[in-house]
Amino acid sequence: MLQHATITKMTDFSDLDDDDIVGLLDQDVNRCVETSVTRHKLAMQRDLTGKVLDGEKRYYEEVVTSVTYKPTHHQLRYENLNTYLYPTNYEVREYQFNIVHRALFENVLCAIPTGMGKTFIASTVMLNYYRWTVGTKIIFTAPTRPLVAQQIKACLGITGIPYNDTAILLDKSRKHREQIWSEKRVFFATPQVVENDLKRGALNPKDVVLLVIDEAHRARGSYAYVELTKFIDRFNTSYRVLALTATPATDLEGVQEVVDNLQISKIELRTEESEDIVRYMKRRDTEEVIVPLIPEIEDIIEQLGIAITPVLKEAVQLGLYDDCEPVNINAFIAMQQSQKILANSSIPEGVKWKNYFILQLLCHVGHMLKRLKIYGIQTFYTYFDNKYREFTTKYGIGKSTNKTAASFYYSSILKNITKTCQAYTANPSFLGHGKLYRVRDELSTFFASAGDDSRVIIFTELRESALELVKCVDNMNDRFIRPHIFIGQAKGKESFDDGEYLRKHAPKGRKKVDRIRRLEEEKRLADEKLRKKEEEKLARTARRTGSSEEAQISGMTQKQQKEVISLFKKGDYNVLVCTSIGEEGLDIGEVDMIICYDTTSSPIKNIQRMGRTGRKRDGRIVLLLSDNEPRKFEQAMEDYAQLQRLIGEESLNYKVTDRIIPKGINPQCQKEFITISEKNSAVNGMEDADSVIKYATQAMLGKLDKRKAVKKSTGKAAPKRFFMPDDVETGIVPAMKLVKSYKYTENGEAFPVAESVKGRRPKSKDTLLDRLEYDSLESELSSPEKATKSQNVVEIRPKLLSDILLKDEDTLHFEHSSSCPKVDSLASVTTLSSDNKSTPDQLKRSQSDNGFGIPPKRQRLCYDTSANCSSTDTHLMEAQSKNKDNPANRKTGEPHYKLEVSPLKREEDDRDVIPQNIAVKPEVPHLTQECLTTGRVYKSEFSKYDGFLTVSERRYFEQNYSPVHLVSLEPRPVFSRSRNRVAIVPHSERVQRLINIFAAMDTDDKVHIIDMHRKHALARRTVHGGPTENSDLLQPSSDGIIVPNDDIRLFSLRPRATDFEDMLEDDEGLSELLDSD
């Protein structure tokens, strides 16, 4: 029985764990991965009752993954897609032609021997993608400047890519980097530069269509190549990768890691024995020379073995090290065993460190034996003497208590070894290893028949050995042989200074005279040490090998390295003694003979060394082997040959990549001799890498053109861009939006809960005081925070003017009418129209002669408006005179008001219901009957003079209540006389002090801070309806109505500049005061 299930998902990314985010990459990350899981039934073991035993698997799953790609998002030149160009400027080689054709449609790892034209293959692929696409980016990356310069020469001098469309990015300066990425199309850079520009937004990863990676065997771990491809792959899977190397890795696991990191779909591997490449290879004669050990070395090895034998036996008895001859102690094995001891937490601390010190001593002896057997007595004694002086000095003053090591270093045999080595090294004519004799013989024989342009490179792993080789060759006193050292930039490790260590840890004394004496002694010794160094430096400069000796001590800077390579190419030096820095990444030039003074177990290093010769002319390789080096070299080369066979047998898991070119189009090869422009061909005559880089930089900046370049304006730096997948919501997303709420029924079924949307007030354009004006109209139910839990948001309704005026106990009450709609929370402003029977006399009698024009408590309010009200009622009318309340002074046509006494109720159900006998008609142009019936607001924003008042209410309010021009905040109003107009109510002493505090904010007067906070607290309690100090002042009186401050609504038609000018100057300070905690 088969069970089949198909799961489709986007490709996984290391830093994107959410499947929803991965799904947003559809448009530009066009890779689609479909995983099919097929379950096959298995035979199961059962008991006598037929029951399946526990742990038995009922089926096994067969997982099949298929990868497909959507059409590319890059813009293509369809008129050029039918052909691809292959330059015939050089000889057409079959293996190059085949690799180019495959690299155009697949991600290829090109692994061919050094000097076989990897640069030409990359240039041809770059040329065709330059022709096929529009506005895309083509990037060549290499770890060193010489390799970048080599590719620039190929692209400009072979393929003819326009120089003004190329750019070189090697320096650390980021000036105009964004502009260069946007204007150019072909780029030559180091991977670190490209990675940094991608992460800071200077380069859009979606624009990359071709990425060429040189020295691709480095694409392991966290190297820049790995991070670069990972970043691009997050946003763009429709791009081509071409990886170049001579040796992909040392084992199959390493090759698979490179394939996975670079998304390789095919490896094109060629060896020196391949049929299609062997005829293009120059002859390289390889000679393995087995050098026996000289008697002096054998004598020292024997004495060293006798001294270490007791320690070795103890390690074997404890099971720390395998039993072997003392001369065969291996430093690497001892180091591995010591690390296992430290990592084992079950071993007691005392036993652990005792065993660790035993293995550490065996490791040191192993290094001594290796140096002695492979490099000679001089290199051995340098290491031995440093370790001997370090331990004896520390043990002598009690800083070390390692008795195991003391039994070895204080052995009488070691004292004899020290005396013997000192005698050998003091003799300048003594050669400490048989390899040195062979080096002299090989050089003498080679230069005796070679021309002036012949060059030799000697490779060695250790700096001490490199300097010894330079001195050995220089002592031949042959004017035709001129050696020099070539090492890295790091300084040489200084030897242990026992004198300084003893002074540092000697008793210092507590008296002042002891301290002064010690400081004087340290200064004298420092001056003496500096003088001695200067004398040694002067002595080195007098010798021919002085520059090599100085380089071995302080390292070689990039400037010194370039100078040495330049002199080597010119012929000033014809023998270069290199460490691993010369194996790859440097354009050293043509070399006729390679001498490998030592060998390694890494086939990559061996192949890189041998690849330095036999490029343009025949070469010779001499391998000097001693001790176990022949077996180690053979094993390394056999393993690499086996690796090549496994790669050829398709033993790797390759990736399925995007073809980019539409499937229906199959470009045909068009071999063509490409005419190179004069400016492009100028790089062909440049041998120096710096000259090529300088020329390419000038081309990038437009300085090669004859016309004077227009000076670019230096504006602000472009802001950092963050590239995100398409359709991704940017910004901060609340956590609640990432969670889906579900409710479960009694049956256990889940259904999503709709998200509740809370309405918000429209953002107002008013000033701070205007917003305070709005706040006075809001009721306790106008804020969702103050509403009870049982209330619905829709039931929260604003208050009308009548509610404000009668806020203390009762509210308006109207009779219900089914024909009139209820006012919703955001209902439009309506005008309540009454009959036109009210007269000015009736209105005057209804005002109860209170002087304020405010209706008494418990009176029912009705409004009478003229039928000819125009749309201009939505705007404020001009200011009225102070005696506007006199009916005799009113003009005809003004609205009249009728007040009727009616008891009020406080029920929640009928507080905002429109009465039945009142007809609703819009007086605002945009306020239609549809707005009233549906409850929709007729506009999204309200100005300063709007709010929830009707036009008639507002007119009444302006004529009777608001003759002043600005808002007055009265936390505790004090009236000088009972029947007073609001216009002439003076500020209380407390409010006046509050205004003075606002005015003092401009001068930053700190004295008022305490008083300011106290008034702030008082104002907030009053505004929110809290208790005040004198609540009796707020109670209604018989001669007038005094309402809380938040109910006082004062308006102005023409604001006067003289009124409260000081208080309004610092609106920001008032905002900070009222909004602070």
Curated annotation (Swiss-Prot):
For this chain the motif DEAH box maps to: 214-217
Q: Kindly give the InterPro entries that the UniProt entry links to this protein.
A: DEAD/DEAH_box_helicase_dom (IPR011545), FANCM/Mph1-like_ID (IPR039686), FANCM_DEXDc (IPR044749), Helicase_ATP-bd (IPR014001), Helicase_C-like (IPR001650), P-loop_NTPase (IPR027417)
Disordered as annotated region, ranges: 536-556, 831-859
Q: According to its UniProt record, where is this protein located?
A: Nucleus
Please write the reaction equations for the catalytic activity of this protein: ATP + H2O = ADP + phosphate + H(+)
Q: Which family does it belong to?
A: Belongs to the DEAD box helicase family. DEAH subfamily. FANCM sub-subfamily.
Protein known as: ATP-dependent DNA helicase MPH1
Q: Which organism is it from?
A: Eremothecium gossypii (strain ATCC 10895 / CBS 109.51 / FGSC 9923 / NRRL Y-1056) (Yeast)
